[in-house]
Amino acid sequence: MKALEWMGDSLKILDQTRLPVEIKYRMAATYEEVAEAIEKMEVRGAPAIGAAAAYGYALGAIGYSGELADLPAHMEKVQHRLAETRPTAVNLFWALRRMEDRLRDQHEAKELAEIRQALVAEAENIAEDDRRVNRLIGEHGNAIVTAEANILTHCNAGALATVEYGTALGVIRAAQQAGKKVHVYAGETRPFLQGARLTALELMNDHIPVTLIADNMAGFLMQQGNIDLVIVGADRIAANGDTANKIGTYSLAVLAHAHGIPFYVAAPTSTIDLKVPSGQDIPIEERNPKELREVFGVQVAPPEVPVYNPAFDVTPAKLITGIITEKGIVTSPYSVNLLKMMVRS
């Protein structure tokens, strides 16, 4: 299963809200359809959102039929619509900046077709970069996995969250491919159940041993000595190493620290936002209260009960053992070492 696939004039998006019960695709032929798919979390995961937005931007040019001189104004509207879909995942903005830069490079183009072709090519480059980067993350991350390891992960940072292979699950895949004996504990990840619906499905399809647990069981597992390592993905990493990831990640980091268990973040350098000094400056998306009051359309709480539903939390850098990127593994002091790595790259 691929999270997304370019079909030449449309973007084929796997509707992840239907998994694992049903495999259904959306054929997005306009940038608005791509934006809706991102907002509804049909496509999710920071790298996949970035790639989808890039293709959506290209579709904005493909669907434009006005004068060439008016294209920049139209594309600004396209950029704004895509940028407002998910405020926390920085890969979205990174990909859109690349697309805007490519559009500016076409200022001497005489035909719309030439510009459209260039934008599609850049979106394809972004997707291909993600495939390559995730493999490298897996290779570097394999070094932290022992010959036998029980690994806890949260949410879904696998192939379904990226163009291919995954970040946190990419490390696990690389370890298995290296002949290591890994067993994964996947937290269900309330309220959207990405761990239960997506991570468990991915790992079972790859024949990687996995046990599903409720989110509130993690501490007990650690206390029993059943967890050797925690690996999670990221939606935005601040300059000081503070990391925004799916809600519940911070709790796992605190528990891992209390039990002396290494806690790693796996993410591409495109997820690192040096413009954001610390986690306090990362915008946190809040989602629809219905996601807590209902489970798959079934009411599980009083319909009028007030709900607080942040999609992400921030794990302080002091709780993170290392950040696994395509350039290598970065450790503390993150404010120094992240900058060094980004300058080198």
Swiss-Prot record:
InterPro entries: IF-2B-related, IF-M1Pi, IF_2B-like_C, Initiation_fac_2B_a/b/d, M1Pi_N, NagB/RpiA_transferase-like. Catalyzes the interconversion of methylthioribose-1-phosphate (MTR-1-P) into methylthioribulose-1-phosphate (MTRu-1-P). This is Methylthioribose-1-phosphate isomerase. It comes from the Bacteria. Belongs to the eIF-2B alpha/beta/delta subunits family. MtnA subfamily. NCBIfam families: eIF-2B_rel, PRK05720.1, salvage_mtnA. It catalyses: 5-(methylsulfanyl)-alpha-D-ribose 1-phosphate = 5-(methylsulfanyl)-D-ribulose 1-phosphate. The record marks C155 as: Transition state stabilizer. GO terms for molecular function: S-methyl-5-thioribose-1-phosphate isomerase activity. It is an enzyme of class 5 (isomerase). Substrate binds at R44, G45, A46, R86, Q194, N245, K246. The active site is at D235 (proton donor). Pathway: Amino-acid biosynthesis; L-methionine biosynthesis via salvage pathway; L-methionine from S-methyl-5-thio-alpha-D-ribose 1-phosphate: step 1/6. Its EC number is 5.3.1.23. Pfam families: IF-2B. One of its GO terms (biological process) is L-methionine salvage from methylthioadenosine. Keywords: Amino-acid biosynthesis, Isomerase, Methionine biosynthesis.
